A protein has these predicted regions:
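Catalytic or ion-translocation cores adjacent to nucleophile or general acid/base/metal-coordination motifs
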Residues: 2-9, 17, 351-354, 374, ...
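Catalytic alpha/beta active-site cores
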Residues: 2-3, 82, 88-395, 402-409, ...
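N-terminal-proximal low-complexity accessory segments that begin disordered
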Residues: 2-91, 99
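Hydrophobic alpha-helical scaffolding
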Residues: 7, 11, 26, 30, ...
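Generic recognition of stable, solvent-exposed alpha-helical segments in well-folded globular domains
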Residues: 12, 16, 20, 31, ...
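Generic, well-ordered alpha-helical scaffold segments in large soluble proteins
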Residues: 16, 20, 24, 39, ...
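Intrinsically disordered or highly flexible coil/loop and linker segments, enriched in small
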Residues: 26-31, 46-53, 67-74, 89-93, ...
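Acidic, glycine-enriched catalytic cores built around paired aspartates
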Residues: 81-85, 89-139, 143, 147-148, ...
């Protein structure tokens, strides 16, 4: 009798998954699929119960915190902190130490720059992101709201010369600032003197000009573009007076942009079925083998995309060299709370998906460890989300060691990025870094998930401030400062990335340029952006500001953050004085955000997309956005700031808004007027069951209704 699986050791392995590992992943590697699954079985046997026990500990701690708040309506900060220490929520400080991570690529340890995050499920998006290592500054200025799209500057017709001239003016201003000329401006350049040994420009007044800092000149590209270097970032100046529509001879400026890219299996991806998960692994395999490609139709034309080749240059001494044409990629695995039935135990129970991710993405990375194209240092970079405290970090480090042994990989090849996005990790960040000290290459902050956990952890304590006002609370600024100061205290300077969160408005590039410099000023060596265009524009910040110099100042001041502020819960001020109008605005905003994201997740399997908010501004949303919005509504409902009836009305009203926002999509399935589709049910359940959802995570409900949708469709 045929089955859909085969038994290997103590596992039931889905047949299509076995075939994928056997015929695709192991092809070209010195390991067989049977050996791989036998090793996976042994690792699951060793770590599965540990995974379960760590999740039990989360529940136990949350239960104790809930009880404490129910019995302590007025919070004494000292007593509260002592309580958290007594129950093991806060762990002992590990003392002074420095991380000992080795074999880290320069993109992580030596270069500050933008970082993209891209769902692994979409080949086209993955290729766009990884190929965004270099980007045209002219295109990004001309095509975005950095230059207002109105009056004589409109983009309503091709090659608006006034807009082109303004684009070139902005680019020349940028060059004058970051690579200045002696007694001249880039506006005056007509051409470059064809000489390799030094950089000399012809000016429109007949004179010559050179760089104030001649060491910034690195060489020439194969087609004669000028390669400069500033703050460890490269840029190309394209001189071509014949093609230039501007009075100067500068045709374009090509910036090194997305230095690193996180290829995401987690919050921005939706992989409910086995086929979807295998598709995600296959895309990552294409990246590591360097043969990923995508073919699609745009405006009636067939377009094919593949990974960029390296860029070739000749240096000032006439020697040939190359620079990477692609981002260095990291891979984000799922958290330890996720499970899969693609590989089951013999009793048909699900296994931890995080363990499977660690094994499979590491197996796939063996292709790059042979080629040394992505990582020149022979490392593999795994970003691990949703870790709660040092015990879970240690568990992950032990797991990585076992994966290395199983796959015959050199010790400490698997590096880790730790997301500082859960409250227990924030309060124990130094201890978390200590547990990962020989592997850690990345820490970062993220407002959405971190606030979602802040709300859920203190759910019983009281009603929280309006979602957009929580950033004004003391805990949040301390959280952001603490991440940088603890990271530098532990020796991450020029060894590992310290990151900041996403700019969520992909169409608002002028606003991004005005606001995102604060991440660099805070000491962050990388910061998340939503698109290749945003990466190129954000790269201008890193040219203008030396992050490593700022980090040195922070280290020299040795100023500790006031960690007591981390315990200040962001309560709603004077809830009795909150007007009904403000309540309705808040719950409408949250309901619209939830519906706009969930309807695409359930009906289309899209884990990350640009969703219009209630004011029709496009926002990049993933499950982190959903977590904070659903937990905030659940909190207000629990504390009777609003009623169930008000929330039901908000969801129905906002479903009509979301339907109208998507009416031009021929594949969109409206939620109104019946309000009984799976997307609508999932959205409301996320709120009405929000208090019960472990840590406020949304996956269980999303997956349940996505499965129902797929079953109904089939």
């Amino acid at each position: 009798m045929s089955t859909d699986h085969q038994i290997i050791n103590e596992l039931k392995v889905d047949n299509i998954f076995f075939d994928f590992i056997d015929k695709e992943v192991c092809n070209g590697l010195d390991i067989s699929a049977i050996d791989f699954f036998q090793s996976l079985s042994e690792i699951l046997n060793k770590y599965q119960n540990q995974n379960i026990n760590l999740l039990k500990k989360r529940k136990e701690l949350q239960s104790k915190i809930d009880d404490w708040h129910l019995n302590n309506k007025r919070i004494d900060q000292k007593k509260y902190k002592n309580f958290l220490e007594d129950i093991g929520y806060i762990t002992p400080n590990p003392g002074e130490f420095k991380i000992g991570v080795e074999e880290v690529d320069d993109e992580i340890s030596q270069i500050s720059g933008p970082q993209l995050v891209v769902p692994v499920t979409n080949q086209r998006f993955v290729l766009n992101a990884v190929n965004a290592r270099w980007g045209s500054l002219f295109d990004c200025l001309y095509g975005t709201n950095v230059i207002p799209n109105k009056g004589s500057m409109t983009t309503s017709f091709a090659h608006n010369l006034q807009r082109v001239n303004h684009t070139a003016e902005l680019a020349c201003e940028f060059l004058d600032e970051i690579a200045p000329l002696k007694g001249a401006s880039y506006r005056q350049i007509t051409s470059q003197v064809k000489y390799t040994g030094a950089l000399i420009f012809n000016l429109n007044n007949g004179e010559l000009a050179t760089l104030i800092n001649p060491e910034q000149y690195i060489g020439l590209s194969e087609n004669g573009n000028i390669l400069l270097k500033n703050n460890d970032l490269h840029l190309e100046i394209v001189c071509d007076q014949e093609r230039s529509l501007h009075k100067s001879g500068i045709f374009d400026v090509i910036l090194e942009s997305a230095i690193t890219t996180i290829v995401d299996f987690e919050d921005s991806a939706s992989t409910v079925t086995n086929e979807e998960k295998i598709h995600a692994y296959r895309n990552y395999l294409g990246l590591m083998r360097r043969d990923l490609n995508s073919t699609f139709t745009k405006n009636g034309h067939t377009i094919s995309r593949s990974l960029n080749k390296d860029k070739e240059y000749t240096d000032v001494n006439g020697k040939k060299f190359s620079l990477s044409g692609t981002s260095l990629t990291l891979v984000r695995n799922v958290g330890i709370h996720m499970t899969t039935k693609m590989v089951r135990n013999l009793d048909d129970s699900a296994t931890p998906e995080g363990i499977l991710d660690a094994m499979v993405t590491s197996l796939i990375a063996l292709h790059d460890l042979k080629l040394k194209v992505n990582s020149k240092k022979g490392s593999m970079y795994i970003v691990k989300p949703k870790l709660h405290g040092p015990d879970e970090v240690k568990y992950t480090m032990d797991l990585f060691s076992s994966v290395e042994k199983a796959l015959s990989i050199r010790k400490n090849t698997l590096k880790i990025g730790v997301m500082d996005e859960e409250r227990r990790t924030t309060l124990n960040l130094k201890a978390c870094i200590y547990e990962a000290r020989d592997r850690i290459i990345f820490i970062n902050t993220g407002f959405l998930d971190r606030t979602g956990d802040e709300i859920h952890t203190s759910m019983m304590a009281g009603a929280m401030r309006s979602k957009n006002l929580i950033k004004e609370e003391p805990w949040y600024s301390t959280y952001e400062q603490n991440n940088v100061s603890i990271g530098l205290e532990c020796g991450l300077y020029k060894k590992a990335q310290i990151g900041k969160g996403m700019w969520a408005q992909p169409d608002q590039m002028r606003e991004m340029l005005d606001n995102k410099m604060v991440h660099l000023e805070a000491g962050a060596s990388c910061s998340w952006v939503p698109s290749p265009t945003a990466a190129t524009l954000h790269a201008t910040h890193y040219h203008r500001f030396n992050v490593f110099r700022r980090q040195q100042k922070i280290i020299s001041k040795d100023k500790k953050t006031n960690q007591d502020d981390l315990f200040i819960i962001p309560f709603l001020k004077l809830p009795d004085q909150l007007s009904e109008e403000k309540i309705i605005i808040e719950i409408n905003n949250n309901a619209q955000s939830i519906l706009g994201y969930v309807v695409r997740w359930i009906n289309h399997g899209v884990g990350c997309s640009k969703v219009q908010d209630i004011n029709h501004v496009g926002l990049m949303e993933d499950r982190a956005t959903l977590r904070i919005s659903s937990q905030h509504m659940a909190n207000w409902l629990y504390h009777e700031i609003c009623s169930k009836e008000q929330i039901e009305k908000a969801f129905k009203d906002m479903a009509i808004v979301v339907d109208n926002q998507n009416k031009h999509d021929p594949n969109y399935l409206p939620m109104s007027p019946k309000f009984n589709c799976y997307a609508f049910k999932a959205s409301t359940e996320l709120v009405f069951e929000g208090v019960k959802q472990e840590n406020g995570y949304t996956e269980d409900i999303l997956i349940k209704y996505r499965q129902k949708f797929l079953e109904a469709r089939s």
